[in-house]
Structures are given as C-alpha cells and as structure tokens.
Amino acid sequence: MRFRERQSLHLISLGCTKNLVDSEVMLGRLQSYTLTQELENADVIIINTCGFIESAKQESIQTIFHASSNRKRGALLVVSGCLAERYTKELKEEIPEIDIITGVSDYDKIDSMIAQRRSIESAKVFLADEHNERVIIGSSFHAYIKLSEGCNQACSFCAIPQFKGKLHSRTLQSTLKELTNLYNQGFRDFSFIAQDSSSYMRDLGQKDGLMQLIRAVDNLNLPISARILYLYPSSTSLQLIESIAQSKSFLPYFDMPIQHIADAMLKTMRRGADKATHLELLNAMRAVPHNFVRTSFIIGHPNEDEKAFLELHDFIESFAFDRINLFAYSPQEGTAADSMPNRPNTKITNQRINTLNKIIQSQYKAHNLALVGQEVDAILEGKSEVSEYFYKARLKLWGKDIDGEILINDSEIVDSNNQMLLLKEGYYRVQITQCKDNFLFGKALSHL
C-alpha cells in the first residue's frame, strides 16, 4: 500500500503579537501539514498580513508578491489578516494570483478553506479562546494570551475599530482555562495582550475586569511570570497599577502607549485623558519597586507644532522611560486625522524623530551600563541570532523580543566532571558582565 505524502506548509506572520496568536490558531488547525522554512517547497503558503500603518501595508503587499513569484507550480497562496480584511476587493482585483483571501473572522476555519480551495467571509471578528488549539511559535517557555478583540476608543489616527469592530472580550473563565492549558504544556512566562487591555471585560459589564484577572491568576498559585501589554490611559486607574504592584504573578511591567504629552495634541488625537492624568499614572508606575515603564509616541500628527514637539522633547528627556517606540504619523483613510489640516511635512517629522532618538539612545545606554556587575533574574530563550556561540536571554521583567537581549557567553553551570552543561529555556540567575555596542553580555550562574 502506498501512503500519501504529507503536504508542506509555509506560514509568514506579519505585524503585531495579536496577529501572531491568530497565526498560531491557524497552525493548530493545520497540524496534518509538515511545516517548512522554504517557501519555494511549500504546497500551501499562508501570509497573515498587517494593515495598521502604511509601512505595514507595503510590507504585506511585497510579501504577497514575493510569495506569488517564488512558489512552486500548484502551490496554494492564502492571504489572511488585517490587510485582507480592509482591502478584500482591491486584493482580488489587483493580485488575482491569490487563491484564498480571508480577513480577521475565520482563522478557525482555515483547514476547511484550504481543503475546499475557497474563501470564507464571516461577519464576526474571530477571538481565540481555550477551545482553539494553538501551535506556539518561537518558544516553548513563553506564550501570548489574547484578552479581547476590537476597541471602543476613538483615537483620531487609528483605523482598527473600522475593521476589528467594538471591544469584544473573552470571559474570565475562558482566559484562566487557556492559561492553565498552556501551563500544563510547559509554558511559564506569559504576556497578556489586546488593543486596549485595561478595558478588558468592560463590554461584559465589568469595570474592573483586568483587576479581576490579576486576582484570579494569583489565586491559581502557579509558579509563573506574567506581564500586561497595551494599557490605555483613560481606562487605566491608580487601583489597577496598585493591583499589578501587589501581584505575585504579574511583574511590575507597565506598557502604556501615550502617543503624546502636550494637552493640545492629546485633545487633537482624541486620547480621552489630559496631561495631568498621564503624569499621575506614570508617576504611580514609577513609584512601584523594580518597575519597568514602556510607551510609544506618534510624531508628525496633524497640529503638532514646534511648541507641542518641544513639550514632548522635554518630557521624554526628564521622565526617562525604560523603553520608547517612536512612530511617524501615517495617514489612514476613514480616520478623523486623515482630513485634519496642519500636518508637519516629512522632513520636519523625520528631524523630530532623529532628535528624540538621540535622547532615547543615550538613556538606553545609561540603563544598560547601570546593569553591568549586577546579578539579575533572567529568562534564557535559546541560541542567539547574533551568533551561534551565544545564548539569548532577557531580564525576567522584560517583554519577549521587544525590550532587549542579553548575550550569554559564559556559564558556571557544570556537570559532575566540571563540564559546562547545555542550557535550555527557562529561568536563570545571570550576572551582567559587559555592555558593548548596545549589547549586554552575561554569565549564567544558576538555573532557577
């Protein structure tokens, strides 16, 4: 008897970690396929796209064209995700080489679509729950858990509510079940994500949903580390910050994109909170022992004049965030900002970003130098992409892939013959030995 050879699958996940979770759900539905790193050899190619800002759209389109041009004869090309949701008609007309187009509603039906070689377009945005098996990408120790989809905020620059809809939270019980399932599979480090994490369960009538989650996770008494990403200023409270500070499971990690600090800009951007509120929240975060505060800013939004920029400049210089992402304003059709006047030109925007980056890089260097000589709790994640001779680690406090890397090039962990043991993913005590060219180097002292 001759058995049919398993078909091969190549998946490219673009954009944010929320998109990554959806990609992992698709892989969970397609476990009968053999994963291949070689696009040219794949029987099925899936590109889970991002369509948030212009650069993300261009990356998605270029990736689609590359896949179409380089796939083997007969290979199926599937395009999913935000770009596919926003521009279904345009993609069908302009890139007819795409075999299946599906947006953000049917990740759990990907196996049926491929089997039937046809698209499915449902109305309701998909939100993974504990019943959706995932194949976690890139780690056997860390996993993302998505709390909700959609957003009830009305930021002037953001198109997400147009294609992701209103806030749609999963239940507390669903979230806890997924956490427990992942823990039982061996995962120990978790990042909870959403478009607006601090509004979790508000659509279910719970104003303190995220605080309920923190208490419930603590009550599980699991030996884990966790952090919450994407807090929103107008839905974050001092009580929430205190809940995170007192938690035995959640780290004092505060990721709150504030986008600007000048009152005039916060109003123009429709952020729902003023400068005083932002400062109150940020100062409360800074008061938490061993805190880590991360944010993002948009530069060049309409009405950002020199006065507003200088106010932001001085604020960044004085507050010294642990991490900052800077984005040049990207016009999005259908948003309030798209029709606003007084947009700084590209040259001015780039100059402002360059000016701020100099401050930020100086602050990062100071943060890194302060770590040299310290012993820290870290998470080792495997071999580094910098070199096969280094292990890759991060402070336990840091988020995966976004906050930095420690290159481990020495270890005191040895066997009975005093031979250095191979290190596996997990918690370690690490001594930071050097900071060079923005890289931290460390020595593994013990497995925790």
Swiss-Prot record:
Gene Ontology cellular component terms for the protein in this record: cytosol
Binding of [4Fe-4S] cluster 1, residues: 16, 50, 82
Cofactor(s) required, per the database record: [4Fe-4S] cluster
UniProt EC number: 2.8.4.4
SMART domains tied to this protein: Elp3
Every MTTase N-terminal domain range: 7-119
A single MF term (Gene Ontology): aspartic acid methylthiotransferase activity
Radical SAM core domain: residues covered: 137-366
SUPFAM superfamilies: Radical SAM enzymes (SSF102114)
InterPro entries associated with the record: Elp3/MiaA/NifB-like_rSAM, Methylthiotransferase, Methylthiotransferase_CS, Methylthiotransferase_N, Methylthiotransferase_N_sf, Ribosomal_uS12_MeSTrfase_RimO, rSAM, rSAM_horseshoe
Enzyme class, UniProt record, top EC level: transferase
Keywords: 4Fe-4S, Cytoplasm, Iron, Iron-sulfur, Metal-binding, S-adenosyl-L-methionine, Transferase
GO biological process terms held by the UniProt record: tRNA modification
Cofactor note: Binds 2 [4Fe-4S] clusters. One cluster is coordinated with 3 cysteines and an exchangeable S-adenosyl-L-methionine.
Localization per record: Cytoplasm
Chain sites annotated for binding [4Fe-4S] cluster 2: 151, 155, 158
Role: Catalyzes the methylthiolation of an aspartic acid residue of ribosomal protein uS12.
Protein name: Ribosomal protein uS12 methylthiotransferase RimO
Lineage, top ranks: Bacteria, Pseudomonadati, Campylobacterota, Epsilonproteobacteria, Campylobacterales
Gene: rimO
